[in-house]
A protein has these predicted regions:
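N-terminal subdomain of nucleotide-sugar transferases
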Residues: 1-51, 56-57, 370, 374, ...
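Carbohydrate-associated surface elements
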Residues: 165, 184
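Nucleotide-activated donor-binding/catalytic signature segment of Leloir-type glycosyltransferases, i.e.
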Residues: 255-273, 277
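A charged, aromatic-enriched C-terminal amphipathic alpha-helix characteristic of glycosyltransferases
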Residues: 353-381
Length: 391
């Protein structure tokens, strides 16, 4: 069979969706006889071919100089690629114009199309508008967004979600045929070995007793990074020599991070880390991975951190419970800097190596990419068979 992934959430500086599709390509090439086609935005229009894989880059305008994300607006080019390739199944990882084009092309070419609900964007963007628009206007906007989500995702043959809890929310909104798919992790790259923590900490010039906190991801409102920066400032007020924050990522809230660096010397910022092996080194060196987001649905970085033996702390109420492989006793009860700062202090008093070791073992047992993709491709087969029966 030939499978096609179509998304505009794709940056050369990495990101969860990019890692997901490239791990899928690697699995197809090493474990199956299938073909794969990936259609994404890029700085120029070109096709990169490797064995049974083709990546189509469509020239698209840059919308973020920090993260290098682009808006895929040339919908005719998408249509032409799909007409030429004629895949057996299309997966859309986008809730906007690209998704509607995937659905329309699928109907025209008689190809089943599934949607992957990577980000719970109504909560991330619309809920926050309530405080500016007022309760009545905000709720009206939320109702409109629910209808949009329902109409879009009911146009797919199936909607894939990385969390059963999130799937329940979509079902309550009227989205049908929701299928839960686990996230995976490359346990060869992201593992507790080798023991290079001392070398990495020396590179960062950290005193032996200082706790290293790590954040990996975009610096953006929907990631709640401003709250993380405020929480770290409070930590250093109470204990200026006890913690160090390493941030790997860039985005619209970089100015808040620069302000934090100006006030707190114990902050290191790396705008990007494109090498997975280097990223794994930083995961291993950290005492604790801090995940401040409350609307995260994908959360691959949290899974990678645990696979490397580093536990995760965050704020209760997110959709990430399924991929947190150790207890969440220390997680923050409130979405405030004070609560997150207290949570980090409490978590650091626990036996973090023991928590991390358990999480790493479970990641290897349950969530290796081959195991995850076996389940995903079973869903693909089921969707394809049902689609043919309906025709």
């Amino acid at each position: 069979m030939k499978f096609c992934d179509l998304t505009q959430f794709y940056s050369p500086l990495s990101g969860g969706v990019k890692r997901y599709v490239h791990e899928k390509i690697a699995y197809i090439q090493s474990e199956t006889e299938h073909e794969h086609v990936l259609v994404v935005p890029g700085p120029k229009t070109e096709c990169v071919t490797s064995e049974r894989s083709r990546i189509y880059f469509i020239h698209s305008p840059l919308i973020s100089r920090a993260s290098h994300y682009r808006a895929l607006v040339n919908l005719r080019a998408i249509e032409q690629i799909l007409e030429r390739e004629k895949p057996d199944l299309i997966e859309s990882g986008d809730p906007y114009q690209v998704a509607w084009k995937a659905i329309a092309s699928g109907e025209a070419l008689r190809i089943p199309v599934v949607g992957f609900y990577h980000s719970h964007f109504p909560e991330a963007y619309v809920r926050s508008a309530v405080k500016f628009l007022g309760q009545t206007a905000g709720e009206a906007m939320m109702d409109f967004t629910r209808r949009y989500v329902r109409n879009l995702y009911n146009s797919f043959q199936a909607t894939l979600v990385p969390s059963a809890r999130l799937g329940s929310v979509l079902s309550e909104w009227g989205v049908e045929n929701v299928r839960t798919v686990n996230l995976g992790v490359n346990t060869t790259v992201f593992s507790p070995s080798p023991d290079d923590t001392g070398e990495t900490r020396a590179e960062l010039e950290l005193p032996t007793a200082r706790r290293l906190l790590l954040y990996v991801g975009r610096l953006a409102k929907e990631k709640n990074t401003r709250l993380l920066f405020h929480a770290f400032a409070k930590l250093t007020e109470n204990a200026p020599d006890d913690f160090h924050l390493l941030v790997i990522g860039d985005g619209p809230e970089r100015s808040e991070l620069e302000d934090l660096q100006a006030r707190c010397p114990n902050v290191t910022w790396m705008r990007y880390c494109t090498d997975s092996s280097d990223l794994a080194r930083y995961y291993r060196a950290a005492d604790l991975f801090v995940h401040p987001g409350t609307q995260e649905t994908f959360g691959l970085v949290a899974l990678e951190s645990q696979a490397c033996g580093t536990p995760v702390v965050g704020i209760r109420g997110s959709y990430m419970d399924r991929i947190i492989l150790h207890d969440q006793e220390s997680w923050a009860e409130e979405d405030t800097p004070e609560s997150l700062a207290r949570t980090i202090e409490t978590a650091c008093s626990r036996n973090l190596p023991r928590l991390g070791a358990r999480a790493s073992r479970l990641a290897g047992e349950r969530l290796s990419w081959p195991r995850v993709f076996e389940c995903l491709f079973a869903i693909y087969q089921d969707v394809s068979l049902n689609y043919k029966k309906q025709r």
